[in-house]
Amino acid sequence: METNNFNDDLNTNTVQSYEDACQLLGIKPTYPKFVQCAKIDRPSMIAYHKLIIIIRALNLLPNSKPWIPDFNKLYESKYRIWWNIIDNKLSFALTANTPSSAYAPFGSRLLFRSRPLAEYCAKQFKDLWQDYLIINQE
């Protein structure tokens, strides 16, 4: 089974906001309003936009190349965040090693190359995850 021995401290120390992630990736932060989407869906769309940028930055390899999950490598570890949702609030439960298969229930853009990165993202960006996963009907 493959494991990665990368030091994830650089990424977690560098990426503490959406803007930090954009800077690390060398892209300009954008703030789309998703006006073409139903108003109730906009917070989720904005959060997803930010999360994929943040996760891409967190998953950068030490050589600054992007990590892209390879579903052809059966034993490549991939991690996802598991949430408990109670009273419309998120509670971080754990990260799970996602086995490679043709079935990707959580979406490959939201996977992590290591458990520490997944745990960091869950804690640091909990509000974004909540906006992405929960419909706020207020």
Task: State each model region's role.
Residues M1-S44:
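Charge-rich, low-complexity N-terminal segments
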Residues T3, Q16, N72, I81-N84:
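Assembly/interface hotspot detector across virion components, adhesins/toxins, and nucleic-acid enzymes
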Residues N13-Q16, R42-I52, R113-P116, Y120:
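Alpha-helix boundary/N-cap detector
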Residues G26, K39, N59-N63, A122, ...:
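Short, flexible coil/linker elements and helix-boundary hinge sites characteristic
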Residues Y31-Y75:
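Acidic, glycine-rich loop-and-strand cores that form catalytic or ligand-binding grooves
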Residues I54-S64, Y79-N88, F112:
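Aromatic/pi-system hotspot detector in well-structured domains
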Residues L74-G107:
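Short aromatic-glycine-(Arg/Gly/Cys) micro-motifs in beta-strand/loop hairpins
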Residues N97-E138:
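Short, compact, well-ordered microdomains
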